[in-house]
A protein has these predicted regions:
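Transmembrane alpha-helix boundary and packing residues in multipass membrane permease domains
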Residues: 2-3, 40, 81-82, 119, ...
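Membrane-water interface regions at transmembrane-helix termini and the short interhelical loops
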Residues: 117-125, 145-157
Length: 295
């Protein structure tokens, strides 16, 4: 999105994407526990070879994701007003940001749903499926972005629409893969399990620490963009590009996080404590090495 709007006739588009994306990040990143929590519970069920719990972990998380996504869509006006309260951007930036926000907000159920599916696939020791779906989402997003912006002349609205379409394509692709590839598990789906309130309590309790960690992380990135808006639209645009480099680095480290979630849960479920100890030590060594290298 940032690359496409960067070639339009105003830096205000870059600033608008930065502001709108920061608002979305503040919302969605706080739901990242859907992916991390789901992968952990699923990996433990995988290690214990408990297909019923593998199905239950997906169902619980997916219900939470779709419910939260729908609520976000319903509260979009309030969220947008609250978001603009923290950003002192120019009028043009706010107008473009609002146009982008009002279209892309409808992707909320698909985005949170993908958090759940990604976490579940990783917990099932299947990292390839999320990777291929992510590649597909980005290819479709780029193609539609170029078409809507340069052919249909829709500018920032075209960018938002392209992202919206790509997210739903990714969600339904994940649903299709799950239905066809994991038939031995999906037959254990029982909606009566949704009445198990204690299971939901455990899910939220375990993920409370992740939520606190995410709040701290999002607060830093939001503060960075908020301060940038006070320095003018040019500084906002430049800092928005710098933030993309920070996010790019985080993707490298996410590989270790995915491995940790999948393998740690698997070894805990299988009660293989020695392998768990070896895994934790190696993850810390590789994580520190990569961090030092990038620094």
């Amino acid at each position: 999105d940032m690359a496409v709007v960067g070639h339009l006739d105003s830096e205000d588009y870059i600033g608008a994407i930065a502001v709108a994306t920061t608002i979305f990040n503040f919302i969605y990143w706080n739901f990242s526990f859907l992916r991390m929590g789901t992968s952990g519970f699923t990996a433990q069920a995988f290690g214990a070879q408990d297909k019923q719990e593998q199905a239950n972990s997906l169902l619980r998380s997916l219900v939470i994701a779709l419910s939260a996504g729908t609520l976000i869509v319903l509260l979009q006006s309030f969220i947008l007003r609250l978001g603009f309260f923290f950003f002192d951007a120019g009028d043009a930036v706010k107008i473009y940001a609002a146009e982008y926000f009002r279209i892309y907000i409808y992707a909320a159920p698909a985005i949170l749903g993908m958090y759940t599916f990604n976490g579940w696939f990783i917990g099932m020791q299947d990292a390839k499926t999320p990777m291929f779906i992510a590649i597909g989402i980005n290819i479709v997003n780029i193609g539609l972005c170029l078409f809507f912006v340069y052919v249909m002349k829709m500018n920032i609205e075209g960018v938002a629409l392209a992202s919206l379409c790509a997210q739903y394509l990714g969600f339904f692709s994940a649903l299709t893969v799950w239905f066809n590839k994991y038939k031995s598990v999906n037959k254990y789906i029982k909606f009566s399990e949704l009445k198990d309130i204690p299971a939901f309590r455990i899910f939220f309790k375990v993920n409370s620490n992740i939520f606190i960690r995410t709040i701290a992380l999002v607060a830093v990135t939001t503060f960075f963009v908020s301060v940038s808006t006070r320095e003018g639209d040019d500084i906002l645009a430049v800092n928005a590009l710098l933030m993309q480099l920070f996010i790019l680095f985080s993707y490298f480290m996410d590989g270790f996080a995915y491995s940790a979630e999948a393998l740690t849960g698997r070894y805990i479920g299988a009660k293989q404590k020695e392998l768990l100890k070896i895994l934790v030590k190696r993850l810390f060594r590789w994580g520190i090495a990569i961090a030092v290298l990038f620094t």
